[in-house]
Amino acid sequence: RKLGISSVFRVNGPAGIAALGFGTESIERVAKIVGPGSPAVALAQVEMQRFGVSTMMLLGPTESLVIADETADPVRLAADLLIEAEHGNDSSVVLLTTSISLADATDAQLAEQLDALPEVRATAARASLGPNGGCVIVDDLAMAIDVANAYAAEHLQVAVADDQVDFVVDGLINAGEILVGQHTPFSAANFVIGCPASLPTSGFAQVSSGITAD
């Protein structure tokens, strides 16, 4: 109500996109369709552009990056990585750190916490952390900033010492969202604090931003 939304329709998949784009007996044709979805939904949105419907950029698989130094808690770090890694087999999760000891401790925690996940989630998480993601060791936080800007992640968390937070955040240019501190996990952005669900993926954070409403 606060956004002025007067109609809500329970439709899903490409059929739902078509219903909104062409209109039906019960759904009025719309001018714009935005929001995340499966590859089939994304393709349906692209197809609707041929019929004069405005849509957003294509959204690929979710991708998350964490910049962490030796002060980060590996237990919570592993949990935050798994929050995103369990999305699906095509997701990508990357730990970017200046600390080899933190990388080792986080790896051990990931192995332990993966065993506690349901098998279907664990399988997806292993793909996101392994073939699609991993850990990158950098010399210092300045290099971490450069790597993060080049990667242009959809979700980015900064888990560094308090006196380094401003330095890192001020240097970050390309990211769908930036979460500061381990008290701001990816789950908070996904479900609690109001960040948009439609965020740029596949490097598009270099040229675009998330969907918001005024």
Residue spans for each PLM region:
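Short, solvent-exposed amphipathic alpha-helical segments in soluble enzyme
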Residues: 1-2, 25, 48-51, 80-85, ...
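Active-site rim loops that border cofactor/substrate pockets in soluble metabolic enzymes
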Residues: 121-159
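C-terminal core of ALDH-fold dehydrogenases
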Residues: 150-214
